[in-house]
UniProtKB/Swiss-Prot annotation:
Protein name: Mannan endo-1,4-beta-mannosidase A
Coiled-coil region: none
Active site (catalytic residues): 318 (proton donor), 406 (nucleophile)
Gene: MANA
Annotated keywords: Glycosidase, Hydrolase, Repeat, Signal
Function: Hydrolyzes 1,4-beta linked polysaccharide backbones of mannans, one of the major hemicellulose components in hardwoods and softwoods. Shows very high activity against mannohexaose but not against mannopentaose and smaller mannooligosaccharides. The major products released from mannooligosaccharide hydrolysis are mannose and mannobiose. The reiterated 40 AA domain is involved in binding the cellulase-hemicellulase complex.
């Protein structure tokens, strides 16, 4: 192990040497519709740029990266004309909107990590709100370590009385977070589990159904005078739940229609005179009105709880903007969230809810009443939205799962994986966002839904359980008869239960028999084998990518830890082909099953 320790020491020294800040002056970049100024004091270089008066105005600098990876980025700016939001691009792809707090002098805005290729890259700032000044872009001249997204997640739901089905769903999401990204789709307004044009497009293009389905209680308030004919939204959701035997995930938002003393009911601020501040003040008629509406929607959700159906619940969504009546006062909105929670959980006994906050991240955010964080992004491209993800992840210190609760374009899945942008799930809005080729072609949908990282409905367990012991993130559909083999021996114990052996060791669930995984859309038993590196204090590698070698053997890195590589022989090696790491069968002949890995045929060990 001496050589391995030397390598680790050298890596640490290299990173410490390279991890310095490199400044790229904005005035030296490519300017579109903006000019160089020198009036303000405190700038570096030959000046600064602004003012970003018109849409599309931009500054772009070219930066050098010594290696491919994630790099911390900051922007030196001045926003003396008020808080501004403008868009960041990397290599001509949108990575998210950046909020620049109002100030009176040049200050540094930490943007977070961005993904850079080895060599030349472009970083740009494009006018959205505009009207600000940029002095320089600053990156660390060494890539960051891989992000640990799951180890700090809150272990349980905020509601200690959550029903077993909700606990199981949360554990399932938690177990897969940082490993898989679930697919999702928003249905038509007022519908639940409908398999209309959105689902039909997905299924036709991909052969898959989304893991997460979304409904909207948009018509379920007392002021709303129009709602669909029977069956109502609750009946539709229950029918969907029964049809798929609990093997689906339902999410819901509430476009809360309400009327003030004058005017019609609405959820947009501009269309209702309803007052949020009064609504969270006990004794007002506005307070009494919201309580009656909460009671109404709780009656619907209570029916879902009666059939053991958990629900990812997203009320007061997009409260970081002022376009909805509940979003124009962060402090009052946070108070309304707590009123919702207390009324629904403690008064109505709704324990099937997983609470998703989709809005402000500030001192008012009701962190102790939140399970999951949602972000809504309607981007102009399929970028992974790295900056938006990192901003929300970092605000909660990695304790809350971050999901795309609404998206226009699905982010490129492979880019998400490469850049450690682990959205728990994506959830595409309905209508043209999923139906039109200008947003998604059939080829893109097929690529994204069939990506090995994406989990669709066919891989979900049933969440319809009356009890749950909390020791797994999923369940398998095999029988539960006892087996003396517990997965700790080299013999494949699952064959006796009618399931194949896993090639990898990705644990999806555990029961009295042993550990279970999913490969080729089928449950398989995981056999935990020992290897030469374990006596040295290091686990066995699942893959076989060699990073280093010493007198002990070959070493790889997995899960940010060194591991020992075990070189197995298989029948294919005698024919001049390597052994497969996975077990996806492409072809079969007289020798056995064949797969393709690293653009080469390989033999599958059965």
């Amino acid at each position: 192990m001496k050589s391995l320790n030397v390598i680790l020491t050298l890596l640490s020294l290299i990173i410490s040497v390279l991890s310095k800040k490199v400044y790229y002056e904005a005035e030296d970049g490519k300017l579109n519709g903006i000019t160089v100024f020198k009036e303000l004091s405190g700038f570096s270089g030959k000046g600064y740029v602004g003012r970003f008066e018109n849409p599309g105005n931009s500054v772009t600098v070219t930066v050098d990266a010594p290696a491919t990876g994630m790099y911390d980025l900051s922007i030196i700016y001045c926003a003396n004309m008020g808080q501004k939001i403008n868009s960041l691009t990397v290599n001509d792809q949108s990575v998210g909107d950046i909020t620049f707090t109002e100030n009176t002098k040049f200050e540094t805005k930490d943007v977070g990590a961005v993904y850079l290729n080895k060599g030349k890259n472009t970083i740009g700032l494009v006018s959205s709100w505009g009207w600000m000044w940029v002095d320089a872009f600053v990156i660390n001249d060494a890539p960051n370590a891989a992000k640990d997204v799951s180890s700090k997640l809150n272990p349980t739901l905020v509601n200690p009385k959550a029903i077993p089905a909700a606990k199981k769903l949360y554990d399932f999401l938690k177990t897969n977070y940082g490993k898989r990204i679930l697919s999702g789709q928003v249905g038509a307004a007022g519908q639940a589990g409908d398999e209309g044009q959105e689902i039909q497009r997905i299924q036709k293009a991909t052969g898959k159904l989304p893991a997460v389905w979304n409904m909207d209680f948009i018509f379920e308030s007392n002021d709303c005078t129009w709602r669909p004919q029977n069956p109502d939204i609750t009946e539709m959701a229950i029918n969907w739940w029964k049809k798929y035997e609990g093997k689906g995930i339902m999410a819901a938002q509430w476009h809360w229609n309400i009327a003030g003393k004058t005017g019609d009911f609405a959820f947009y601020s501009k269309d209702t005179t309803f007052n949020l501040e009064n609504a969270v003040t006990e004794g007002t008629w506005e307070y009494e009105k919201i309580i009656k509406d909460i009671d109404r929607v709780s009656g619907h959700i209570k029916k879902l709880q009666a059939v053991n159906m958990p629900l990812i619940w997203r009320p007061l969504h997009e409260n970081n903007g002022d376009w909805f009546w509940w979003g124009n006062n962060p402090k009052a909105c946070a108070k309304l969230w707590k009123i919702l929670y207390e009324r629904m959980v403690n008064y109505h006994g709704l324990n099937n809810l997983i609470w998703l906050w989709n809005g402000n991240n500030d001192a008012n955010t009701p962190v102790d009443y939140i399970d999951i964080i949602g972000v809504d992004i309607y981007a102009n491209d399929h970028g992974p939205q790295t900056t938006a993800y990192n901003t929300h992840f970092d605000f909660y210190g990695g304790k809350k799962m971050v999901v795309l609760s609404e998206n226009g374009r699905i982010p490129d899945i492979q880019q998400c994986v490469d850049q450690d942008v682990w959205w728990g799930y994506f959830q595409t809005w309905n209508s043209e966002f999923i139906l039109q080729d200008s947003y998604h072609t059939d080829a893109q949908l097929k690529e994204y839904f069939n990506h090995k990282t994406v989990m669709n409905m066919d891989e979900l367990p049933s969440f319809n359980v009356d009890s749950y012991n909390g020791d797994s993130g999923s369940s398998h559909n095999g029988n539960s008869e006892s087996n003396s083999n517990t997965g700790n021996s080299d013999e494949c114990w699952s064959i006796n239960l009618g399931y194949p052996c896993c090639i990898g060791d990705y644990v999806v669930t555990t029961d009295e028999n042993g550990d279970w995984g999913v490969e080729n859309n089928e449950w398989c038993g995981i056999v935990h084998k020992s290897c030469w590196s374990e006596p040295l204090g290091y686990p066995c590698c699942v893959g076989n990518t060699v990073i280093s070698a010493d007198e002990s053997g070959d070493w790889g890195v997995e899960n940010n830890e060194w591991c020992g590589i075990v070189h197995k022989s298989c029948w294919a090696e005698f024919l001049g082909y390597p052994c497969c790491v996975g077990n996806t069968v492409i072809s079969t002949d007289e020798f056995g099953d064949w797969g393709v890995e690293n653009d080469d045929w390989c033999g599958i060990l059965n």
